[in-house]
Structures are given as C-alpha cells and as structure tokens.
A protein has these predicted regions:
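RNase H-like, metal-dependent nuclease domains and their acidic two-metal-ion catalytic environment used
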Residues: 1-83, 114, 118, 122-199
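Conserved phosphate-binding/catalytic loops in two-lobed NTP-binding clefts
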Residues: 77-112
Length: 199
C-alpha cells in the first residue's frame, strides 16, 4: 500500500496479489491521486476484507504511517503486517500484537528498496509474478536505474511499482515463507538453474 497526500500529485495505490502459489498473480489494483488519507485507510480495509482478509503491508514513510495506524488502532485489522528491528539486518516482518518496537508497516529504506527491487526484477523476468494491470505495466516501463537506486523517469509515476517493490521485499522475509510455505528466492534460483540447463 503506497500512500499519497490526496492533493492531485502522486497516487495512493495498491495491488492485491494472490500468494497461494507461484507464479504470484496480481488480481486487483487501485490508484487515485484525489483520495484523502482517512478515506484511503477505510478503502484499504474494506478491500482487504473482501479479498479473503488479505494481508496488508503499508509503506509508512511520511503520511502512510496514518494509514497503518488507522488499520491497526481504529479498524483493529488482524492481517496488518508489522515490522520490527532486526539489528544489522534492518527490518523484518513479524506477527503478533503491536508493541513499542513494532511498526504497522514498513519504511522504505535503502536496504528495503534494494532487496525489493532485486526480488521484483527476478519475479518479473522469470514470469513468477503475473501483472495484469495496464497502469502497472506502464509504470514498470519507466522505472529505471538512476545512480544506485531505481525510480520513475522524470514526469512519470512509480506508485503501483513501489507497492510491488515492497511485495518483492516481503517475499524474501521468513514470516512470508512461513505464511504460505513458499520460499520465493529458492524457487527463483531453481527456475534459473532449469533455464540455464535448457540452454
């Protein structure tokens, strides 16, 4: 869940991903540059409930923290993904009730973005994430490397893509592996070996 201020600039956006098996499948998207943060939290909550009580990972940089807080404290949404400090490893997904050391979402730091971009790249290149939305495809086509990071080219958006970057990061977390019994990175490595063997 990527959150914007609702002032007509960046988009508040999210994708719903079916994670029951690989390849993962983008089954729904939302993108709006006019929705207010309070309304967006409610919309995310209603959508997650409709999609089988979906797990929700909110980017909590800046105004996104309000969406995470609302999902956690006002709606008491049980499938909100929490993160905690993992020492030198940065952040990790965790379960359980919120505490003083747990956040209702993830801050997009350099390590989170780097891991997320790498995982997303592998998922897309190996056809292990089916992207069904035209806006997402358009954003991916203008999401390029600049210096030591990836971002939208000037005049373009990357709000849906950043949600997928966070999904990529999440697939590499132990909690995600335990949740759906899929080790994404291992599966991607196996697929790479198969492709090399076929060549």
């Amino acid at each position: 869940v990527d959150v914007a201020r609702g002032k007509g600039l960046d988009y508040s956006a999210f994708s719903v991903i079916n994670i029951t098996s690989m390849p993962y499948d983008q089954v729904c998207t939302f993108r709006s540059n006019g929705i207010l943060v309070a309304d967006y939290a409610d919309f995310v909550y209603q959508t997650a409930r409709l999609y089988n009580q979906a797990y929700v990972l909110v980017e909590i940089n800046d105004i996104g923290e309000q969406v995470g807080w609302t999902l956690q404290n006002e709606f008491e949404y049980e499938n909100l993904m929490l993160t905690e400090s993992a020492g030198m490893k940065g952040k990790r997904l965790t379960s359980g009730f919120a505490g003083s050391n747990k956040d209702p979402g993830i801050r997009t730091t350099k390590p989170v973005k780097s891991t997320g971009c790498s995982m997303l790249k592998m998922l897309v290149e190996q056809n292990q994430l089916v992207i069904n939305d035209a806006n997402t495809i358009t954003e991916l086509s203008t999401f390029s490397k600049k210096n030591n990071t990836y971002e939208a080219e000037p005049g373009c958006n990357d709000d849906l893509v950043m949600g997928l970057v966070l999904f990529g990061w999440m697939t590499n977390q132990q909690y995600f592996k335990d949740l759906n019994d899929i080790n994404t990175l291992t599966k991607l490595r196996e697929k790479t070996k198969e492709e090399v063997a076929e060549d």
